[in-house]
Amino acid sequence: MTDTSDARPPHSDDKTRSHSESENPAIDSPEPKVHAPLTNKDWWPEQVDVSVLHKQNEKGNPLGEDFDYATEFAKLDVEAFKRDVIDLINTSQDWWPADYGSYAGLFIRMSWHAAGTYRIFDGRGGAGQGSQRFAPLNSWPDNANLDKARRLLWPIKRKYGNKISWADLIAYAGNAALESAGFQTFGFAFGREDIWEPEEMLWGQEDTWLGTDKRYGGTNDSDTRELAEPFGATTMGLIYVNPEGPEGKPDPLAAAHDIRETFGRMAMNDEETAALIVGGHTLGKTHGAADVNVGPEPEGAPIEQQGLGWKCPFGTGNAGDTVTSGLEVVWTTTPTKWSNAYLELLYGYEWELTKSPGGAWQFEAKDAEAIIPDPFGGPPRKPTMLVTDVSMRVDPIYGPITRRWLDHPEEMNEAFAKAWYKLMHRDMGPVSRYLGPWVAEPQLWQDPVPAVDHELIDESDIAALKAAVLQSGLSVPQLVKTAWASASSFRGTDKRGGANGARLRLEPQRSWEANEPSELDKVLPVLERIQQDFNASATGGKKVSLADLIVLAGSAAVEKAAKDGGYEISVHFAPGRTDASQEQTDVDSFAVLEPRADGFRNFARPGEKTPLEQLLVDKAYFLDLTAPEMTALIGGLRTLNANHGGSKHGVFTERPGVLSNDFFVNLLDMGTEWKPSELTENVYDGKDRATGQPKWTATAADLVFGSNSVLRAVVEVYAQDDNQGKFVEDFVAAWVKVMNNDRFDLG
């Protein structure tokens, strides 16, 4: 990795160092081990990895598959829990003394850095699973000494046990810290369930901490560089940006550019971004007592350190001798009490560039007295700010916002309260997943849907509606594709999208290329007419939502297709979805859910460079599918003729529209020879091996099921003569799973 800082702190050797948003250790990067290939991935790096679909296996969960967190949480005395957390915040421990006698700043940073990994493009990251406990996050430079914060919480976790998850505890600690300082938060929701191994996520392609070269395509001109998708941070191992400025160059205006981009990729607008920085830096401090090398991060630390890293050799190694980032900034005169002092100091002085005791670039108030108290009773200091703090004053957009808040702190308090709530809950999905007594009213960013305000349809109604759908003139492919388009927008990463809300009929989803708007214009009016006719004639206050009818229509089509293939099946259907309005739908926020590709529909946007088979597995990951479920769905959707635009790629059957295992049987037929098409990019032609006559066409999203050894093993099961019925059953089960992915109310 190349050097990321033109002005890094003095160092005992010449290895790269840099600093991160508020904290980040002045340490050497761990060196990747150079070795001969040891795994299949090492030998064949281009082979699609389906093992990602089987992460977070229940076998690794020590609580067992029957454990229900919501049930356990209901036993929690939340008020007693809150008191204990706040008492902990205000009780300094000798092994890691608290700044100013309070861990508020440390816990705010821990919660912020847990939630701040969230990124909008793929919904990965966030505080929702307790990922900060595991590598690489537990050893990121930006998370230095947060291992101590989590250890400080252990007595709380030990006491309350299964009634509070680590994920909830890590997130709530920051909320409690704010309240301990006198701030009125907007609310807090519990409901985050722990994972038991690292989240499967590409954080970047750089192979050393603090690198930027790969995510910016080799250019690091801070004025012109473009951060690649889906990354949410400017630098490997940082949450957002380098607080010394881009590439360590202390330029507040250039830093503002990076701040705007990275916070925007976390779904924050300019006002929310400014509020988070101002509010987050109102309490606590950074740590750069000296220019020394701290020890290795937790994952690289000696076994006797028991998962604690960054051991500091300076002085006592803690308290006033702590080295975390090399930056030594205390933002206010009251670092344990909520106030408007951050803005009062930011605008009350002119600022001049200086170096911290750790050698990092920061700003010091010009011609100022030493009014900042020392955290451990030492001499007072002059006011200091990070480069990124000064950005809040000099940037032409952030500046007017923060200057307004200087005179109207009540506006800042409200903006921060709502932005913090959004930060802590952005990856939790709809309010129906929230637990506890402090849940705030639904917000637009939560993609709200109306509550059910009518009687739900019963079995006889369901049968009548299925009959009406099948007699409407709409085809099996039309009904299947519409239901799939509605439900498959779901992302299991941040629990967004899905069929509930019927947003398929609203912008932006109605216009997405993958959803074939011209086809929706044919299908949706017919379904809306069936809905209106039913609701007008139903008795007992019963109604059917369009969201429910779209799913029910698709299920009716699957049942018909199975029956046409000789199998009588019933596709499970659970009513209870409601229809959102356009006013309840943030068009810009939903835009990031638009699929680049959907291998289940054999769709890819023109010019897509990522291999289609890789994008297919990624889509399956979002839909929380296993490899067998993905395989069953592909085989079924191909025979149901549900491809985008009516494409025949992968439709390996002479009876399209009939649910059968023909896709698998014909894929494995050794009488077919496959070659790349000479006419169409990313298409393969299958010809009769003996005669050379054309038989089929396919994409990589089809042929991967014959080329990948793991997927081929599953295909062979479904192609067997004695497993035709099993395939139908497995397809239906996987179909229902996708249709219900966002039905958190079903439990």
From Swiss-Prot:
Disulfide bonds: none
Amino-acid positions noted as binding heme b in the UniProt annotation, renumbered to this chain: H281
InterPro entries registered for this protein in UniProt: Catalase_peroxidase, Haem_peroxidase, Haem_peroxidase_sf, Peroxidases_AS, Peroxidases_heam-ligand_BS
GO cellular component terms, A-Z: cytosol
UniProt-annotated site: Transition state stabilizer, residues: R109
CC cofactor: heme b
Family: Belongs to the peroxidase family. Peroxidase/catalase subfamily.
Protein name according to UniProt: Catalase-peroxidase 1
Source species of the chain: Mycolicibacterium vanbaalenii (strain DSM 7251 / JCM 13017 / BCRC 16820 / KCTC 9966 / NRRL B-24157 / PYR-1)
GN (gene name): katG1
